[in-house]
């Protein structure tokens, strides 16, 4: 029997912008970085976008985009931040989806409800809005309709599936 494994990356960071300043303020707990988005981007997102493959002598042989080999979703608020603050990582995520389509016929990326709201607890209108906004943001960034959607905290009920 052939067996398969699917590794899925769920990438989400909440919006950290101060709405009065329209800027992310310094977060001391993220030191030495300015804020947690920057720290996580430098320590996690960028290294996976440009992962080093070493040769037998420990020298860099090539760089690979790990995102092209996994299933992943990136929250719309994080994608917006990446587009502005780490455009190389944003583009690597979009390119990973293109590479997966070329290799397998199916994209690696899936959508996520827009604001990470627990959809079963939302009103019907808010639930539909979260799903529509998440799907639309995905279409604008990845250039295709999503084939699936990551549900925040994997919370699900029948009305959520119907949304």
Residue ranges and their predicted role:
Residues 1-163:
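Carbohydrate-active enzymes and regulators
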């Amino acid at each position: 029997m052939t067996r398969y494994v699917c590794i899925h990356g769920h990438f989400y960071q909440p919006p950290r912008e101060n709405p009065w300043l329209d800027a992310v303020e310094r977060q001391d707990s993220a030191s030495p970085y300015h804020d947690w988005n920057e720290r996580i981007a430098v320590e996690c997102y960028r290294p996976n976008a440009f992962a080093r493959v070493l040769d037998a002598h420990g020298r860099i042989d090539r760089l690979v985009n790990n995102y092209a080999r996994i299933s992943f979703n990136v929250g719309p608020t994080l994608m917006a931040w990446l587009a502005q603050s780490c455009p190389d990582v944003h583009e690597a995520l979009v390119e990973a989806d293109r590479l997966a389509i070329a290799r397998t016929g199916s994209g690696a990326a899936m959508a996520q409800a827009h604001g990470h709201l627990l959809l079963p607890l939302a009103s019907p209108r808010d639930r539909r809005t979260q799903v529509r906004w998440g799907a639309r943001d995905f279409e604008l960034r990845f250039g295709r309709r999503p084939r699936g959607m990551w549900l925040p905290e994997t919370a699900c009920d029948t009305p959520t599936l119907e949304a």
